[in-house]
Amino acid sequence: MRLIATLLATCILISTGNLGAEPVRAAYPSANVQFLPAFVALEKGFYKREGLDAELVSVRNAVTAVQALLGNQIHFIFSVGPQMPSIWEGSDIILLAQQVGRPTFSMIVTPDIQRVSDLKGKKIGVSFGGSTFAGTKALLELNKISDKDVQYISIPGSTPKIAAMQQGIIQAALLAPPSDYIAIKAGFRRLVNLADIFKDTSFSGLAATGKTIKEQPQFVKRMVRAVVRGVIHTRDNPQDAIQVMVRHWRMERDVAVDAYQLVRESLNPVPTEKGVELMAQWQAIALNTKPKRPVKEYMDLRFVNEVVAELGQK
């Protein structure tokens, strides 16, 4: 637990700095467009409005994030899929709301690859156990391409994947904004955007432990409300959302615009059971297993439904 605390202490990205407010810590894997609503909520003061002093913590390792959540080192996580294997084994983690309801990844390939079937015999960069591996396998399975038809190369991180493509080590990789656009500017091409294929897949959200939900329901609802406001504002105010990416993530404006356009239609604070099931299938495919629990056992949409109704949203 001391190691987890040390990791978290070195990973805090940004906070509201709201003196007198109730501290809240929420973890996300990386500065990715799928977590944009959480950052918009920070920028627009939605956490402050709820009396919360929010710290958004970057924890790249899903296992570490889950351990930190279960150990009360953090209060919430913004991911949906990475914690599922732990949930299937009995971890008390509950999905409360959604930020992005479609995968944000694009399959980026060398110019010679024109169709998904052309991936046969190619080397694909992946991060084993992560969402890129799950998404890659889901795409290949949908197109009836088996693992034997491709070669997976373990390359964690987007920038190293792009470098590996430039060096000819791999010919394809699943990349999220802004890395996909950066790769395209470097001469590669977007073969397919997974959001166009998997149109209801709960990709990022808000989750907490059942213990926290039971013992601090109003605290949880305030956090849900802040995130829901972030999702709605991100969807309805493109320029604000783009400016957050430029300011906080140091994106070039054209990169931020491309990233926003890819994600805008998938901004929805209320997950569907089907969407969570599809994400569970992604995780199961990546681990070569099957989901061990029905998703309704680890979803609690009471707060998000109440908040959406209170805010007058459909």
Predicted features along the sequence, with ranges:
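Secondary-structure end/capping motifs
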Residues: 214-291
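Short amphipathic alpha-helical segments at helix boundaries and their inter-helical linkers
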Residues: 74-77, 166, 170, 262-279, ...
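Sec/Tat signal peptide C-region and signal peptidase I cleavage site
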Residues: 17-21
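Conserved C-terminal helix/tail region of periplasmic/extracytoplasmic solute-binding proteins
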Residues: 284-314
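Short, glycine-/small- and polar/acidic-enriched structural segments
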Residues: 22-167, 171-177, 190-196, 200
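Bacterial N-terminal signal peptides
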Residues: 5-15
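Pocket-lining segment of extracytoplasmic ligand-binding domains
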Residues: 81-82, 152-153, 159-248
